[in-house]
Amino acid sequence: MESISLPWTLPEPLQQVHLAHFSNLDPATQSAAIIDRIISASRLPSASPEQAQQADEERVKLDFAFLDPTKLCSKLHLLSAVTQAAVVCARSWDDDRQVFREGEASIGGMKSKTPHSEVIYMLNPGNNVGESLKRFGLSPTSSSLLLVKFSSPTADKQAILQSMIDLVSPSNLTSPPTAEAHTPIDIDHAIRYGSYPTTPSTTAQVTDWKQLNKIYKLQIPSTLLNNKQDNQWYEKYQDIICTSVAMKLVAA
């Protein structure tokens, strides 16, 4: 897991973000099961105080952004969306009640229900939250998963990582072969290659270029984007996509 500090001027619950990559998932028994659990949590009854408490506890366990990392071209692509989401959510933060107010897009606030769903929404060029989830969220056919978690700067990182592992599986956590418990990890390698290859210069990215071209209305062939001898096309592509994400707030 990689933890990144965000500006202290943001509300405390947004001052840190944690990213964990999971690979080699079985779509049928893992990806689909996680999606079913998310859907079930949204439908839990809350008529009684006991039911409401149980529903809240289950939703806390699922309080992440669930992304298909093959729809990302790099960590910078993701962090562009994280930053934009944090800015928008800061506008919807109720400091007195210590909650985020949803549905404030018309006044520059949150479009979706949580900061984590706002990250997924920010990745999508369009303004439809459901479309954003379909394009960038975990799907029943996903074989990898990227979890994103906002927290305060004092949150227990190990506890956050453990909650992520409990949700997926320790055997699926993507980490360098020689990484120790407290070794800093650059999640960019996992996003781009699906693992931590010993020779990334000769390893092709796992990014779904065809889908990204379709989503962002680009027509750059994957052969150019995977050219390790000359990565200028990849760098231009990344710049275009990150600019598109950053411009969403301006265009809204």
Swiss-Prot record:
Q: Which InterPro entries match?
A: CGI121/TPRKB (IPR013926), CGI121/TPRKB_sf (IPR036504)
Gene Ontology CC? chromosome, telomeric region; cytosol; EKC/KEOPS complex; nucleus
**Which superkingdom, per the lineage?**
Eukaryota
- Keywords, comma-separated and alphabetical: Activator, Chromosome, Nucleus, Telomere, Transcription, Transcription regulation, tRNA processing
Q: Where in the cell is it found?
A: Nucleus; Chromosome, Telomere
Record flagged with keyword Nucleus: yes
Tell whether DNA-binding is among the UniProt keywords: no
Q: What is its main location?
A: nucleus
A Gene Ontology biological process in which this protein takes part is: tRNA threonylcarbamoyladenosine modification
Role, per record: Component of the EKC/KEOPS complex that is required for the formation of a threonylcarbamoyl group on adenosine at position 37 (t(6)A37) in tRNAs that read codons beginning with adenine. The complex is probably involved in the transfer of the threonylcarbamoyl moiety of threonylcarbamoyl-AMP (TC-AMP) to the N6 group of A37. CGI121 acts as an allosteric effector that regulates the t(6)A activity of the complex. The EKC/KEOPS complex also promotes both telomere uncapping and telomere elongation. The complex is required for efficient recruitment of transcriptional coactivators.
User: Could you describe the subunit structure of this protein?
Assistant: Component of the EKC/KEOPS complex composed of at least BUD32, CGI121, GON7, KAE1 and PCC1; the whole complex dimerizes.
Spell out the family assignment given in the record's similarity comment. Belongs to the CGI121/TPRKB family.
Q: What is this protein called?
A: EKC/KEOPS complex subunit CGI121
* Recorded name of the encoding gene: CGI121
